[in-house]
């Protein structure tokens, strides 16, 4: 059975419960659900044809996933344009690496919510923000910002806080195992940290996600980002964040700590790296899944959020489902108590 057939069967199981092997005129209301794709490090190359085979394969697989399962939006986890970002809002890379690649009709009306990676910061991040006024599907309002959604046909809410981890921690070389040493502008870093601290303290949504380019935890080439482990992780833990999503390392990983906080690493949109160099730098028991096969065309994460739980499925660009996990909705008492 080919992988696209598997996706179609999965769609049927999600949308038409009880439909197999039974005849009935009773219609079951569709499950309230919010769906999105999370893909990082997809940004092509700076020379013709300005994309890679992996990026093209991921674009095709994302389109197939959207057609079969649906998606309300796509979350871009940074490194949108290799290797030195873009020059201005009219840079041809927007067309050649983004518009012409993610061009399937199924993707034309799916919005992208974007954040910057370290390679984007080697160019003009303000130009990527300005491109939001040119492309109807490119949404990048500011270096860091909040997204808020309601799960359709429910009162259940989801918040996603999009961070600029490069401004927060400093830049680094994506192809060398190098930690960001210090923020270029300490005042901007402190302002952003104060913002996310205030936002998380006030967050009353049923699911709270935080996204940034650099990982908190990673077993791969770059490993854990010391700056985020020190400054961001305590906030994620204190405020009962559901999951942190990131890229930077060029593979797929899922980690989960002793508090149930999930770490979704999806950095396989354009390159693949099998490194497990920092396996011993991550606490024992955190790693649940790692995929970095060099002969793979990469992949992405597909997230589904219902009133009951959030599921994360890692999908290879071939269409194969690699790993799936579930995270619970935040307990009402947790965030209501913090508001009291």
Swiss-Prot record:
Its main location: secreted. The keyword Oxidoreductase does not apply. The keyword Nucleotidyltransferase does not apply. GO terms for biological process: iron ion transport. One of its GO terms (molecular function) is ferrous iron binding. Uteroferrin is a phosphoprotein phosphatase, synthesized in response to progesterone. It appears to function in transplacental transport of iron in pig. This is Tartrate-resistant acid phosphatase type 5. It comes from Sus scrofa.
């Amino acid at each position: 059975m080919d992988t696209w057939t598997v996706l179609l069967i999965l769609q049927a199981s999600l949308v038409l419960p009880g439909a197999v092997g039974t005849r009935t005129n009773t219609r079951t209301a569709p499950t309230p659900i919010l769906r999105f794709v999370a893909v990082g490090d997809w940004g092509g190359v700076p020379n013709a044809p300005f994309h890679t085979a992996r990026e093209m394969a991921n674009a095709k697989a994302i389109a197939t996933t959207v057609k079969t399962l649906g998606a309300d939006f796509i979350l871009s986890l940074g490194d949108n344009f290799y290797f030195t970002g873009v020059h201005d809002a009219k840079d041809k890379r927007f067309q050649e690496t983004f518009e012409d690649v993610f061009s399937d009709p199924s993707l034309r009306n799916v919005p992208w919510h974007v954040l910057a990676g370290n390679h984007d910061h080697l160019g003009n991040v303000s130009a990527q923000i300005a491109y939001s006024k040119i492309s109807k599907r490119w949404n990048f309002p500011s270096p860091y910002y909040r997204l808020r959604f309601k799960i359709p046909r429910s009162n259940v809410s989801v918040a996603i806080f999009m961070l600029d981890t490069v401004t927060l921690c400093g830049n680094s070389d994506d192809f060398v195992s190098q930690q960001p040493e210090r923020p270029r502008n300490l005042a901007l870093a402190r302002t952003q940290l104060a913002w996310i601290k205030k936002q998380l303290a006030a967050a009353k949504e049923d699911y709270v996600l935080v996204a940034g380019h650099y990982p908190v935890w990673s077993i791969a080439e770059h490993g854990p980002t010391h700056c985020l482990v020190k400054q961001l992780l305590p906030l994620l833990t204190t405020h009962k964040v559901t999951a942190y999503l990131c890229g930077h390392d060029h593979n797929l990983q899922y980690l989960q700590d002793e508090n149930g906080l999930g770490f979704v690493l999806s950095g396989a949109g354009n390159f693949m790296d099998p490194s497990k160099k920092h396996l011993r730098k991550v606490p024992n028991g955190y790693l649940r899944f790692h995929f970095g096969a060099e002969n793979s065309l990469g992949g992405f994460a597909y997230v589904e959020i219902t009133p009951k739980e959030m599921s994360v499925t890692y999908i290879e660009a071939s269409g194969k489902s690699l790993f799936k996990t579930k995270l619970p909705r935040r307990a009402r008492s947790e965030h209501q108590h913090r508001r009291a």
